Amino acid sequence: MPDATLPACFLSLLAFTSACYFQNCPRGGKRAMSDLELRQCLPCGPGGKGRCFGPSICCGDELGCFVGTAEALRCQEENYLPSPCQSGQKPCGSGGRCAAAGICCNDESCVTEPECREGVGFPRRVRANDRSNATLLDGPSGALLLRLVQLAGAPEPAEPAQPGVY
């Protein structure tokens, strides 16, 4: 009987510690995650001007959003970092954050969102000397383009994003 107590104690100890022993848990255990401060997510996209919103979503104020494209490949690295991150200016939709002008993203998809249109962090104009592929749209042409984008996205508000540029 004494020969069986040592293995039984060892197995009991292993059962209690296996929750964070076999999984990649942070220092302090899973409950310590709420104590950590959120960091800014990794930069991504052309020139590192965007921020990751999920493993396949890269968005920036001047870029728009890249979903499932080569520009968003760097965002897969977020899965391997131990600390949580947060991108975006303000909360929107169901658990999302404003990612670009008029776009709300969570870690799985992006949708058009009126409350993300204009405000802090989403400039209406792009600097003329900026070498990005953005165009200067202000006035009637910009309003028309924004309205067309809203009409195109209105029927499918919760449809998951497909690979492409938004």
From Swiss-Prot:
It is found in: Secreted. The gene is AVP. This is Vasopressin-neurophysin 2-copeptin. It holds the Pfam family Hormone_4. PANTHER family: NEUROPHYSIN, VASOPRESSIN-NEUROPHYSIN 2-COPEPTIN. The modification Glycine amide is found at residue 28. Fetal neurophysin is the major neurophysin present in the neurohypophysis of 7 to 9 month fetuses and its sequence appears to be identical with that of the adult. Belongs to the vasopressin/oxytocin family. GO terms for molecular function: neurohypophyseal hormone activity; neuropeptide hormone activity; V1A vasopressin receptor binding. InterPro entries: Neurhyp_horm, Neurhyp_horm_dom_sf, Neurohypophysial_hormone_CS. It comes from Bos taurus (Bovine).
